[in-house]
Amino acid sequence: LNSLTDNALMLRVKAGDVDRMGLLFERYHRKLFGFLYHMLGQAEASEDLVQTVFYRMLKYRHTFTGDGEFRTWMYHLARNVLADHVKKNRHSVRHSDVADYAEKIGGGVGADEQLQREQEVATLHSALAKLSAENREVLVLSRFQELKYEEIARVMNTTEGAVKVRVHRAMNELKTIYLRIEN
């Protein structure tokens, strides 16, 4: 079962074998958390939204056709869940402690390395937070979630060329902001 593609697993879930959702959860929980965390900056809310995305995958499994990539469909659902959350909590969005995120990504490193990593993550997160939601989303999908431009175009309902331009501009803007914060 571990060798089944994501599409094959989701098609089984669609056919009623909902136990297969556990494998998809194992494969994508951390990636979805990373996407949502980079967009929101709130570890606890991001974890809750991951659960909501998987709930919606089950609820709307009948809409999965298997024609496109499972990841594209999943991130489309995640964008909708995120948009709903932001609308509902417009006035309470805040960025959580870097320590929460550093704990999530973990790793056994020394105290000095850990502190430096946390500082770099904090600076990067601050820079990402200053980007527009569109620029932040395209960077998170391309750089952190490692989606191909073609997949991002389908998720965002735009062209591959437009995605390339947005990523390039967003990277330049992020670099400028990061260097400004660092100095």
Enumerate the language-model features and the residues they cover.
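Internal acidic/polar
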Residues: 2-3, 92-117
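Arg/Lys-rich amphipathic alpha helix in sigma70-family domain 2
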Residues: 59-66, 76-96, 117
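Sigma70-family region 2
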Residues: 14-15, 41, 52-69, 88-90
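DNA-recognition helix of helix-turn-helix
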Residues: 83, 87, 135, 144, ...
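Structural recognition of an alpha-helix C-terminal capping motif at a helix-to-coil junction
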Residues: 34, 48-55, 68-80
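N-terminal module of bacterial RNA polymerase sigma factors
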Residues: 1-31, 129, 176, 180-183
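Hydrophobic positions on the alpha-helical face of helix-turn-helix-like DNA-binding modules
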Residues: 53, 77, 139, 152-153, ...
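Short, charged helix-capping/linker segments at alpha-helix termini
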Residues: 14-23, 33-52, 155, 182-183
